[in-house]
Amino acid sequence: MFKITVFIYVLQLILPSKVHSSPVPDSDNGLREFPLSIVHINDFHARFEQTDELGGQCKPTAKCVGGYARLVTTVKKLKEEGQNTIFLNAADNYQGTLWYNLGKWNVTAYFMNLLPADAMTLGNHEFDDKIEGIVPFLEVIKTPIVVANIDDSLEPTFKGKYTKSVVLERGGRKIGIVGVIAQNTDNISSPGKLRFLDEIQSVKNESKRLREEEKVDIVIVLSHIGLDHDYDLAEQAGDYIDAIIGGHSHSFLWTGDNPPGKEKVVDAYPVEIVQTSGKKVLIVQASAFARYVGNITLYFGENNNLIRYAGAPVYLDSDVPEVPQIVEEMKAWEEFVHEKGNEIIAESRVVLSRENCRVSDCNIGNFFTDAYVHEYVTSHTGPYWTPVSVGLMNVGGIRASVDRGNITFSQLITMAPFENTVDTFDLSGKHLLEAFEHAVTVPNRLGFNGQNMLQVSGVKLVYDVTKCEGQRVVSAKIRCQKCDIPKYEPLDPEETYRIVTASFLANGGDGFTMIRDNKKNYKVGRKDYDVLINYAKYSSPITIGEEGRIRIIQ
């Protein structure tokens, strides 16, 4: 039976109906093609075990997909089937499940070393446990680490642990791999005294050096800056680069009908960007959470011009066999994780979904922010009904949906893995309004995507994102705190409001510097998972829905 399953899976990998291919106009007069197969993953986020189709914890009654054992099966098979294959990892291997909370860098390095990549860049989440949490990983990982835009002059422990690029040889040709990380990593993680340099200029400089000094034939950028920024990078990094293997934005790219999973298609696979010189640069990305492995073959002419390409992401559905060695290696870790993770916290009679969190209020966002407010209502002994009536949550901190049924400790950690504290502070209405404006100002060439959206409790917001930045809040109403009967009143820029939120946001994460720089009477609270556990038990069975707290005109 196993042999039959493997045979069917191999057929799925090579059937042309699932492969997108296209010619690229070529000025190369050579007749011989050089194929370069690139197998790639990104944003693994500690999904060692199989998940449900949305990347959350898989329950016995659900359809399970992905997981590291299937990922290894697929990567090995694609490497064997490809031509001059390279395997690239576009970062954010850290953070996302109880596996990481308990095993940290140790478990990540252990399993990544069972399937070393030819190159790996670093992502923002690799710095979530500060410099001390990444240096040990860099010291033991068997994969070359490439990042071109880090200045480590003030972090001596980081020196010598990575390079700007690496040169691989395949079929007699030299392939340069240049790494790049998001320039705002210091705003969204904890990288100590590292400085992050301009992404485009850093890639341009290193790619030029590779072409001129190392005499490489092909340059691939291994990027963890997000699809929007990859568009800009492809346009502006010069004709030194040929393709970008991306991550960070969890973008599912697909060409054609009938994508295999439940992911929303963001753009084509690959995206084609035409530079002003006429050169085409390709961009690929493979969603997130070990549900897909990217697979593309680039065909170059004798003069190293891109002629054509073929490929598509491979979906790791339940038909993909798991590598027995990996399954066996995981058992000891699973026992350790499951002992804590299988504890039942509460019951939910609704799906707690993050799907719409960037474009409206979502019920999981309502659950988070209501939990934050509830934390302080229950311990309050003073006048009025609460010491804090407004709860805020950055959507990037909500990491997974949860299906209806029992909620375990492991699922809750997967929802909120970052171990923030739930803190309170005073903020003027003026700066609160600035925060609401910042939540909808991130540009996106595919249309508004709410990258920095805030989920809220005790707030009613109407946005018009067709208006100019800084003028998009049409209406903002705040639930009163110092009142006998809670009601919503227009936000007053001169009023002072008591706010509760995660420490990440309170300290200016995601660019919310107006909160960091203007908060008063700051008090640190309990860990977020303790707050969420307490509220889940209080609310069980959970029935929260979408309540129209946020409305967006676009």
Swiss-Prot record:
It catalyses: a ribonucleoside 5'-triphosphate + 2 H2O = a ribonucleoside 5'-phosphate + 2 phosphate + 2 H(+). Its EC number is 3.6.1.5. It is found in: Secreted. AMP binds at residues 358, 394, 399, 418, 504, 510. Its main location: secreted. Its cofactor is a divalent metal cation. A divalent metal cation 2 binds at residues 92, 124, 224, 248. GO terms for biological process: AMP catabolic process. A divalent metal cation 1 binds at residues 43, 45, 92. The record marks 125, 128 as: Transition state stabilizer. GO terms for molecular function: 5'-nucleotidase activity; apyrase activity; ATP binding; metal ion binding; toxin activity. GO terms for cellular component: extracellular region; plasma membrane. Keywords: Allergen, ATP-binding, Hemostasis impairing toxin, Hydrolase, Metal-binding, Nucleotide-binding, Platelet aggregation inhibiting toxin, Secreted, Signal, Toxin. InterPro entries: 5'-Nucleotdase_C, 5'-Nucleotdase_C_sf, 5'-Nucleotdase_CS, 5_nucleotidase/apyrase, Calcineurin-like_PHP_ApaH, Metallo-depent_PP-like. It comes from the Eukaryota. It is an enzyme of class 3 (hydrolase). Residues 1-21 form the signal peptide. Salivary gland (at protein level). Belongs to the 5'-nucleotidase family. Facilitates hematophagy by inhibiting ADP-dependent platelet aggregation in the host. Cleaves adenosine triphosphate (ATP) and adenosine diphosphate (ADP) to adenosine monophosphate (AMP) and inorganic phosphate. Shows potential for antithrombotic activity. Can induce basophil activation. May reduce probing time by facilitating the speed of locating blood. This is Apyrase. It comes from Tabanus yao (Horsefly).
